[in-house]
Structure formats: C-alpha cells, structure tokens
C-alpha cells in the first residue's frame, strides 16, 4: 500500500546554487545585485520539510487521491531562503503517477542580492511511483518585493534525508531586472 507521504517527495527541494555573478549595483541592503538584464546560471539543492506539513483536505477513491496541504521548503546556496508551498497533490494509483501543482512564494536572496519575494502558480512536479523518478519545473516570475528578478528552475528528486524529508537538486537561470 502507498503511504501518504509519497506525494511530498515531488514537493521537496533544498537548493544549493552556484552562479556566474556579474558585477552589480548596490541594493538597498548594501549587498551587490547582479546587473539589470543579466541572466545568471544557478544550480543547487533543497529540502521539503514534509514532517511539518499541514494537511488541509484529503479525498480518496480506489484509483486516486487528492490532497491539499501547506509545506515549507528550505533553500541554501545562491537562492538562500524559504518557500511557503500550498500544494494540491494528485495521485493516480492505476498509472502510478503523482502530480503536484498549486502556489508557492519564495522569500530570500538570489546570488547574494537584497531579499526578494517571488510568487509561482505554474510549478509542476511529477513522480513516477513505479520507478521513483521525480522531476519538476519552477517559475519564480511574479515579483512581490525586493529587486526585480525572474527565475526558472528544473528540479530532480534525490530521495529522502535522514529525517524522511524529500530532497532535490535543481538547475536553471535567473534574470535580474525587467518587468
């Protein structure tokens, strides 16, 4: 029988990022921010704090399950901060697939920038429950606060940590400035 914690495997990501950083102008915090319009490559790791998830609702049938929950993802590296993650998890038991969608807000820094807040309502994580393969895409594009920046990240699951929380690696790019 499938345990309910499997849906979160697709959610989890702790990010360690490396970036090619341009010389930038000081931000209001006094930290350097890569030059406006400059795109930097990023990569790293992350962890989904599944053990502290708040489950809001869960509906199940013999062939599928839908769960709505709120989780926190910790990021370190070039993206250093946290993600508040409100997720809808859909599990298709027949096809052995899990899909996560919903809303998330990132609060932290990017490549040493001043703090930013970015929203994403287009992310999608998939898990093949037969093989364990996990992957997803994140679109941190809706600016809320701080320097203007947009990031697109591809994530790949790396399994649970010692506490049972899902982990992942990611690669992508962030563009400073713009709309």
Feature annotation, model-predicted:
Residues 25-179:
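Beta-strand-enriched cores of mature, soluble protein domains
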Residues 19-24:
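Boundary at the C-terminal end of the N-terminal hydrophobic targeting segment
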Residues 7-18:
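Bacterial N-terminal signal peptides
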Residues 1-4:
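Positively charged n-region of N-terminal signal peptides that target proteins for export
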């Amino acid at each position: 029988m499938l345990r309910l914690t499997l849906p979160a495997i697709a959610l989890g990501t702790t990010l360690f990022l490396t970036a090619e950083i341009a010389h930038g102008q000081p931000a209001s915090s006094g930290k350097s921010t890569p030059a406006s319009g400059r795109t930097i490559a990023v990569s790293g790791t992350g962890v989904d704090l599944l053990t502290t998830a708040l489950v809001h609702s869960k509906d199940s049938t013999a062939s599928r399950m839908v769960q709505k929950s709120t989780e926190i993802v910790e990021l370190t590296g070039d993206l250093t901060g946290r993600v508040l993650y409100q997720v809808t998890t859909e599990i298709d038991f027949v096809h052995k697939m899990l899909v996560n969608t919903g809303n998330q807000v990132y609060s932290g820094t990017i490549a040493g920038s001043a703090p930013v807040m970015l929203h994403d309502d287009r992310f999608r994580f998939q898990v093949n429950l037969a093989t364990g393969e996990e992957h997803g895409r994140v679109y941190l594009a809706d600016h809320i606060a701080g320097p203007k920046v947009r990031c697109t990240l591809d994530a790949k699951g790396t399994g649970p940590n010692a506490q049972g929380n899902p982990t992942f690696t990611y690669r992508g790019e962030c563009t400073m400035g713009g709309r």
